[in-house]
Amino acid sequence: MPPRPSSGELWGIHLMPPRILVECLLPNGMIVTLECLREATLITIKHELFKEARKYPLHQLLQDESSYIFVSVTQEAEREEFFDETRRLCDLRLFQPFLKVIEPVGNREEKILNREIGFAIGMPVCEFDMVKDPEVQDFRRNILNVCKEAVDLRDLNSPHSRAMYVYPPNVESSPELPKHIYNKLDKGQIIVVIWVIVSPNNDKQKYTLKINHDCVPEQVIAEAIRKKTRSMLLSSEQLKLCVLEYQGKYILKVCGCDEYFLEKYPLSQYKYIRSCIMLGRMPNLMLMAKESLYSQLPMDCFTMPSYSRRISTATPYMNGETSTKSLWVINSALRIKILCATYVNVNIRDIDKIYVRTGIYHGGEPLCDNVNTQRVPCSNPRWNEWLNYDIYIPDLPRAARLCLSICSVKGRKGAKEEHCPLAWGNINLFDYTDTLVSGKMALNLWPVPHGLEDLLNPIGVTGSNPNKETPCLELEFDWFSSVVKFPDMSVIEEHANWSVSREAGFSYSHAGLSNRLARDNELRENDKEQLKAISTRDPLSEITEQEKDFLWSHRHYCVTIPEILPKLLLSVKWNSRDEVAQMYCLVKDWPPIKPEQAMELLDCNYPDPMVRGFAVRCLEKYLTDDKLSQYLIQLVQVLKYEQYLDNLLVRFLLKKALTNQRIGHFFFWHLKSEMHNKTVSQRFGLLLESYCRACGMYLKHLNRQVEAMEKLINLTDILKQEKKDETQKVQMKFLVEQMRRPDFMDALQGFLSPLNPAHQLGNLRLEECRIMSSAKRPLWLNWENPDIMSELLFQNNEIIFKNGDDLRQDMLTLQIIRIMENIWQNQGLDLRMLPYGCLSIGDCVGLIEVVRNSHTIMQIQCKGGLKGALQFNSHTLHQWLKDKNKGEIYDAAIDLFTRSCAGYCVATFILGIGDRHNSNIMVKDDGQLFHIDFGHFLDHKKKKFGYKRERVPFVLTQDFLIVISKGAQECTKTREFERFQEMCYKAYLAIRQHANLFINLFSMMLGSGMPELQSFDDIAYIRKTLALDKTEQEALEYFMKQMNDAHHGGWTTKMDWIFHTIKQHALN
């Protein structure tokens, strides 16, 4: 169920001609051909059509034009009714220029909403109606309850609750101000400028207040009222009454954007205020009437769609209407019959035979040995073979899955056989109603992903490929006399108690008894220390079989070390119902763990629904909205590891998205950006549908963003395909001409920025827009900020639109850098990182925030003449900074450069960020250094002639050292350089203390399909750079050596930069 292709305004045509002939079929049977402008609205076309129709026979049979709407066939081969007649012809995405006039029937409002949802998702909602799978139908119905609850919650306290949804407070997770930030205050006080609009002409008045940083907004408003009324010479009693009367009638808004201080958080907990304190800027806030804000809020009306009233098509046993038996009363081993395969396309000359490889897995772990079919000729792939597995049916865990692949085998004379997977698939052994699968089944398989090293793909998606022209495997499961169900919790608890009492009756000295028996009553002090040591290990460190036995035998004591849970779960034998039942009872009463630890339980190693449910409950209890926003990319990705459509994680994220519009905004884009991926398009499409149904009026804002992005995709496709051989001047002329067209002006102006929904994008500043020189022809776009106080924040908003580059890796790297920055700030390290905005919005399409007043190192070096451009003059960068920051601000600029350079040295080293050259390292006018373009990480560095081009652990050239040491000749012998080194050492050790978090965040991204993040082996690079097998002292010594290599090997970086500069000059 893939989303629509972006094929232009008509099928296979990027842009309609300025005038186009449209054939219109009238209800009286007449076909009228109209010449229409491509930008014409439907209401204009209808008016012209009915004027023209009077010249044709049978016109008297027609009713008034207002009785009709247009209908046509779109590029998705769907029949669409066009209720919104303000839409333009060029935006209808017609298959052919043909319109039919009809009288509308059915529920008009629901049809309009379905169209809007379909446009936002990128596929018609009616496709979900046609899916016969009862799991899909039940999910669509049941998830509406979550939507209804969230909408009711938003309307709980009327206008204030709605305002909190639309403008959620943008606050830090903790009210505590780090010491180094507090030290920037004057005795704990901050100066705030309060602005008031005093006339209809937007005349402004300001009041400067000095207040305690931990004041709540109401106290700031009270102080502003006191200051405003000072000239009125009120008595203290009158003043008190005045404050009481007006204090609750106003709110504070950040000048220049749509951010409001609606809750009673300390002022310095609001991110805007904290940022101002850090940067030494004066916060500018606007005083506005609450009623003025409340009156602008849309009234959301949630109505249940018609499909909610349909009767479930689930089979009788799913509804509990037929006899069932427990899985645990079956007394046979698992077996599966492989029948035959179709659509297996192979080259008969290259391949001798094919066979089917199968395995029973729990997450990435096999529950028994894999089993293969016989080998057969690829011309006749039939087996009709029963495969027997070394596991009893009662021992199957709830998340067991059958993994299959059709494999080819090629044998060369005297050489080892070559086995290669041709296609793969996975099947859950229990369906969403806890029922064991049975009977015959046809499974359409998936193409083998890049980088798959094994013959099976156990952590891949379950279920059939929607593309029916792929290899298809027919198989058969055993039938039983009754429907077989996984036991419920009461049966599991009963079995666990029996299992524990049976264990207690054994004598530990009895020969041959397992060393996994519970031994909590004989726990020694060194055993406790060993358990504590295991609990602190990173998620990638291997647990030996002996350690697994040790953990399991002390499982009851483990409850006193809650964070050991992931390790204990890995020690469970998931092919033993005795152990699984006991583990379920332990998890049921396990103490909550921190959200960052709970997230580990959501990766591919922990597929069990009860375990994942425990993790979600920990997130519900302790994860703040700020932290949720921070980790949202990963939480969306691990939805792929959920067994079924309806699960606790889906419900948790959906509820959060529907009660916090900022979270909802990014939730929408993270899901939509993967709708081209067939493995998740159904799951993500259904979730997007439910979000769009209940997000209220924000759906219209999202559709404005989607429309703008589609226009830009179409434009850049033309530039890359039809105009690629034209000169820059001709391309620019085309761009400006297109953007001046009415439909482009409508679509590309006056919408919320996808990068930050608190920022409005006003009118396009066409004279400032340009096509960038790189191969994918990115667009540099510039919008006015329409906020009436824009001059106090920024007056224009610049964004780079990219079509053709996968920005997911950039987005992940910038997120990790942002988290590193937070860790450093909380530990008193102000390293001034600059994780600019970046958002992937589709298949190799995305947006990047332009950082103001910044220049690449190459641009700066080129300003230093030929010597500087060719890197021979290492003083160019220092001189440029000196010229930009004269007098007293020079020291501050050098300090800022030093701090940011230290931060990026540590971050790029730990993450193995490659392809570093003077075009992707930038410096702001005030001295702040930052990196851009993160196409290579985890040590996947560019190669030249088979060798890694970069030979140093991170970039620390002579140019940087000269700036850090304020121009000294012997840079590394200065006090400034020593201070820089100390910053790097502290920063490195601070991140090392949080190694588990970073490993978990990368592990959760394994399902993303990023080329450089394919396996745990890739993530192991972080273990290496953080030296997690060493003591802290040894790790620091290791990092010191890397740092030494960096500044002594700086000349190799310089050589790379020289060649990069020469290449860039040749291209330009």
UniProtKB/Swiss-Prot annotation:
Changing C420R: In CLOVE, CRC and CLAPO; uncertain significance; somatic mutation in CLAPO patients; shows an increase in lipid kinase activity; may increase the affinity for lipid membranes. InterPro entries: ARM-type_fold (IPR016024), C2_domain_sf (IPR035892), Kinase-like_dom_sf (IPR011009), PI3/4_kinase_cat_dom (IPR000403), PI3/4_kinase_cat_sf (IPR036940), PI3/4_kinase_CS (IPR018936), PI3K-type_C2_dom (IPR002420), PI3K_ABD (IPR003113). Residues 771-777 are annotated as: G-loop. Pfam families: PI3_PI4_kinase, PI3K_C2, PI3K_p85B, PI3K_rbd, PI3Ka. Coiled coil: none annotated. Transmembrane segments: none annotated. Residues 912-920 are annotated as: Catalytic loop. Residues 187-289 form the PI3K-RBD domain. Its EC number is 2.7.1.137, 2.7.1.153, 2.7.11.1. The record marks K776 as: Implicated in the recognition of ATP as well as PIP2. Also crucial for autophosphorylation of the p85alpha subunit. Changing E545G: In KERSEB; also found in an endometrial carcinoma sample. Changing E542V: In BC; uncertain significance. Changing T1025N: Found in a glioblastoma multiforme sample; uncertain significance. Residues 16-105 form the PI3K-ABD domain. Keywords: Angiogenesis, ATP-binding, Disease variant, Kinase, Lipid metabolism, Nucleotide-binding, Phagocytosis, Proto-oncogene, Serine/threonine-protein kinase, Transferase. Changing E542K: In CLOVE, KERSEB, CRC, BC, CLAPO, MADAC, CCM4 and HFMH; somatic mutation; also found in glioblastoma multiforme and endometrial carcinoma; somatic mutation; shows an increase in lipid kinase activity; oncogenic in vivo; occurs in the interface between the PI3K helical domain and the nSH2 (N-terminal SH2) region of the p85 regulatory subunit and may reduce the inhibitory effect of p85; requires interaction with RAS to induce cellular transformation; increased AKT and RPS6 phosphorylation in HFMH patient's cells. Heterodimer of a catalytic subunit PIK3CA and a p85 regulatory subunit (PIK3R1, PIK3R2 or PIK3R3). Interacts with IRS1 in nuclear extracts. Interacts with RUFY3. Interacts with RASD2. Interacts with APPL1. Interacts with HRAS and KRAS. Interaction with HRAS/KRAS is required for PI3K pathway signaling and cell proliferation stimulated by EGF and FGF2. Interacts with FAM83B; activates the PI3K/AKT signaling cascade. The avian sarcoma virus 16 genome encodes an oncogene derived from PIK3CA. The PI3K-ABD domain and the PI3K-RBD domain interact with the PI3K/PI4K kinase domain. The C2 PI3K-type domain may facilitate the recruitment to the plasma membrane. The inhibitory interactions with PIK3R1 are mediated by the PI3K-ABD domain and the C2 PI3K-type domain with the iSH2 (inter-SH2) region of PIK3R1, and the C2 PI3K-type domain, the PI3K helical domain, and the PI3K/PI4K kinase domain with the nSH2 (N-terminal SH2) region of PIK3R1. This is Phosphatidylinositol 4,5-bisphosphate 3-kinase catalytic subunit alpha isoform. It comes from Homo sapiens. The lineage of its organism: Eukaryota, Metazoa, Chordata, Craniata, Vertebrata. The gene is PIK3CA.
